[in-house]
């Protein structure tokens, strides 16, 4: 079954991992003197448990280690987690959340239409808040749950869950932590966190983070980025069994990476042009978030309430080349999206023959965004623009579009586990969701510009320009969609020994439906809109796994095999464009099946030597291409690949660290990592875009080259090296690293627009050093 991956077991042993290579803590390297692997406690199933005792495929990354290794971004945090892919997100297009493009086991998010974000296939939580933001600093740990988690986590947990847990305040302990990093491209990254007790029942923790980089590729402003974040948490614990944590956070993500990046050859050579520098920042996200977490232990049960409100504002800028063959600046922005999440759950205390959990959840989102395209001049971007006849005067507006809408989701859920015997347990869970959504899309079109791209005249000039009288303004009515969904989980687990667990599970997940709209040109040249209602996508998972500790707790072997039946996998495929260049979409819906495995081994060879090998295999294939509803056009017309793009068929990570204990008790840790990724394509394209030799059909000069040639990357391996020093009590730490030793560059993301393949490259070789101080 797995031979199609083309990867033997012996080959896996030669493959490797990722991440900046810096010193780990003494305990993470087994240097604490215990000589055994440490226990890791998580709340993945809404209870506090040892991760080795949970019958599910889970990975954990500790915040202290990630900070010491300089791994700050979501991509870096998750880069060595098996079968997890963080897709490229163009700045200013982060789908209401900077973490909105995570795929687990091949389950990718719905492609957006015309700037409208689609639902995420991975549920991201920050401090128990769904779609929370700001979890990448002052981080305690990250939990990654692979496989559908619909019963406990609900909407968007089709592929799995990524849960960020930041540090809570601590009573009766004053502490300060400072992290700093400097690296290639003037990278400056720093975090400060202060824990301040305010009596026996009250404590506050304040954390601030800043991350700035000039980027690696473009001149002038190039891909400069800047991140500024802050959070304050207040802990109130008047009773031993009552705990209240309230939090407020704010952040600003700014980037100048919205300029044009054009792949000029199909061999990987990439030409980069800057976008206009008159708009600053070119892309940015801004958020504020407020949350409260209250838990009360009754003795026989624990009641938990989690409530949050947050807003998200986004703007973006991009330069493209479009009809009528003149450069275009696209400016996008959103009014603050408003999010409201409320959850109440009651769970039995562990230890009984029957453990249970019941809960209710409410989630709402109100959103609005606009996008405007104007002609771009040479004075703004050099060779990418046309001659500016009147310096200082903006080019004409070509078109603008936008959307606004609201979404509400109501849910009830429950899960019970019954101990049939001391070593045999059965679990059943269920969840019911009801979603209500409305959306209005509006569209303005203007071709009243002359050969210099400046606005001239009124709508009467349209006939002279196009030969056809066209109206100037188009609008659309509401699209509405209501969905109800039921998900379930059935699982059996058996303890072969106290350190060896075997489990089998059938579970379901769903990706929420969505109401979107697309331009729909009519025969007379006018444009109306058609509704593109995405149905709910349902996935049924069959999984068998095992978790093991052997050799006196020095070797850990975890693994799982899975089969997914994914009915109605949907994507918005571009079929053409309006006279102004606005894209026109249809929805494709095809059956998909995923087959794969996760494997993770950690071996404490000696108290000073740790070796980690993990691997992920997934074969994500479209099994058939039915005709589009109401047509005789096969959906393969709009889907060039049978294998889902952006999902590597194989990844593997190999990590080795050795701890030297010096005479004064300090620790020196050299570390080496290697990460292997199988080749493939990163974005979906149509059959026409995948055709060579047809003028105007595909990409490149003359649009004669298959867009797929620009997008494909071969297998690659990234090697990272690092060296870290830790003081005897862990108060001080110094680290140095080299990432991507071989300077391997590949296309990380591709945006195809009007035959122009805009490519975004991966990071080159980088160097850096970091420090931390804790007292």
Residue ranges and their predicted role:
Residues 291-318, 495, 501-513, 517-518, ...:
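Membrane-embedded beta-barrel scaffold of Gram-negative outer-membrane proteins
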Residues 347, 356-357, 422, 426, ...:
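Gram-negative outer-membrane beta-barrel transporters
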Residues 218, 256-278, 317-331, 372-402, ...:
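Solvent-exposed loop segments that connect transmembrane elements
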Residues 120-121, 136-141, 146-230, 241-242, ...:
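Outer-membrane beta-barrel translocator/receptor signature
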Residues 565, 675-692, 724-775:
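C-terminal beta-signal and adjacent terminal beta-strands/loops
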Residues 36-171, 544:
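Acidic, small-polar-rich N-terminal luminal/periplasmic segments of exported/outer-membrane proteins
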Residues 235-241, 346-349, 355, 361, ...:
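Structural signature of Gram-negative outer-membrane beta-barrels, strongest in the C-terminal barrel
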Residues 1-81, 195, 240, 296, ...:
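N-terminal Sec signal peptide and the immediately downstream disordered periplasmic leader
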């Amino acid at each position: 079954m797995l031979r199609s991956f083309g990867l033997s077991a012996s080959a896996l042993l030669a493959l490797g991992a990722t991440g900046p290579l810096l010193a780990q803590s003494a305990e993470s390297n087994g240097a604490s003197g215990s000589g055994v692997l440490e226990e890791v406690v998580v709340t993945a199933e809404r209870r506090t448990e040892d991760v080795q005792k949970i019958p599910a495929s889970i990975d954990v990354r500790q915040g202290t280690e990630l900070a010491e290794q300089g791994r700050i971004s979501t991509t870096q945090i998750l880069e060595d987690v098996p079968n997890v892919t963080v897709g490229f997100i163009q700045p200013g297009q982060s789908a209401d959340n900077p973490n909105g493009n995570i795929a687990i086991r091949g389950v990718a998010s719905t492609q957006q239409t015309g700037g409208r974000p689609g639902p995420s296939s991975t549920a991201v939580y920050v401090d128990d808040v769904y779609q929370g933001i700001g979890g990448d600093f002052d981080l305690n740990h990250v939990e990654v749950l692979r496989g559908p988690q619909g019963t406990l986590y609900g909407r968007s947990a089709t592929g799995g869950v990524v849960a960020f847990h930041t540090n809570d305040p601590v009573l009766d302990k004053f502490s300060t932590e400072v992290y700093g990093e400097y690296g290639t491209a003037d990278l400056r990254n720093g975090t400060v966190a202060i824990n301040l007790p305010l009596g026996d029942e009250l404590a506050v923790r304040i954390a601030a983070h800043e991350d700035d980089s000039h980027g690696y590729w473009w001149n002038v402003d190039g891909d400069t980025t800047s991140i500024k974040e802050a959070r304050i948490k207040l802990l109130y614990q008047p009773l031993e069994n009552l705990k209240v944590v309230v939090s407020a956070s704010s952040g600003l993500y700014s980037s100048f990476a919205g300029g044009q990046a054009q792949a000029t050859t199909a061999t990987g050579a990439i030409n980069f042009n800057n976008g206009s520098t008159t708009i600053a920042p070119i892309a940015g996200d801004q958020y504020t978030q407020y949350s409260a977490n209250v838990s009360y232990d009754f003795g026989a049960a624990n009641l938990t309430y989690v409530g949050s409100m947050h807003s998200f504002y986004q703007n973006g800028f991009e330069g493209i080349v479009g009809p009528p063959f003149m450069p275009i600046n696209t400016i996008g922005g959103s009014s603050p999206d408003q999010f409201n999440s409320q959850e109440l759950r009651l769970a039995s205390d562990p230890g009984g023959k029957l453990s249970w959990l019941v809960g209710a959840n409410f989630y709402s989102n109100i959103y609005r965004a606009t996008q405007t395209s104007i002609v771009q001049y040479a004075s703004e971007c050099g060779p990418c623009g046309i001659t500016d006849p009147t310096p200082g005067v903006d080019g004409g507006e070509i078109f603008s579009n936008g959307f606004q809408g609201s979404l509400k989701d109501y849910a009830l859920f429950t899960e019970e586990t019954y101990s049939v015997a001391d070593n045999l347990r059965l679990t059943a869970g269920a969840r019911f969701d009801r979603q209500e959504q409305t959306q209005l899309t509006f569209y303005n079109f203007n071709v009243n510009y002359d050969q210099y791209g400046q606005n001239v005249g009124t709508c009467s000039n349209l006939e002279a320009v196009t030969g056809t009288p066209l109206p100037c303004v188009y609008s659309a009515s509401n699209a509405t969609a209501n969905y109800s969904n039921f998900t379930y989980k059935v699982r059996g687990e058996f303890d072969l020994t106290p350190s060896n667990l075997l489990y089998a599970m059938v579970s379901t997940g769903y990706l929420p439906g969505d109401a979107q709209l697309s331009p729909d040109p009519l025969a007379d040249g006018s444009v109306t809109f058609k509704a593109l209602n995405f149905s709910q996508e349902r996935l049924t998972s069959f999984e068998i796994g095992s978790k093991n500790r052997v050799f006196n707790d020095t070797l850990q072997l975890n693994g799982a095999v899975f089969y997914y039946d994914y009915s109605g996998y949907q994507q918005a495929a571009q079929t053409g464009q309006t006279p102004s260049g606005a894209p026109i979409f249809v929805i494709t819906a095809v059956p998909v099946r995923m087959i794969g495995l996760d494997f993770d081994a950690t071996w404490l060879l000696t108290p000073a030597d740790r070796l980690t090998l993990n691997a992920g295999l997934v074969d994500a294939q479209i099994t058939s291409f039915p005709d589009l509803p109401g047509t005789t056009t096969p959906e393969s017309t709009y889907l060039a690949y049978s294998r889902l793009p952006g999902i590597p068929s194989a990844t593997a990570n190999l990590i080795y660290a050795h701890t030297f204990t010096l005479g004064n008790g300090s620790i020196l840790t050299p570390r080496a990592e290697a990460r292997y990724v199988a080749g493939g394509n990163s974005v979906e394209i149509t059959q026409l875009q995948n055709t060579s030799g047809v003028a105007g059909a595909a990409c490149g000069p003359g649009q004669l080259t298959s867009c797929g040639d620009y997008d494909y990357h071969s297998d690659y391996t990234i090697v990272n090296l690092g060296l870290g020093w830790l003081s005897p009590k862990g108060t001080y730490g110094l680290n140095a690293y080299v990432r991507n030793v071989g300077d391997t560059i590949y296309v990380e993301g591709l945006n195809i627009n009007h035959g122009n393949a805009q490519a975004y490259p991966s990071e080159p070789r980088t160097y850096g050093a970091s420090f931390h101080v804790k007292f």
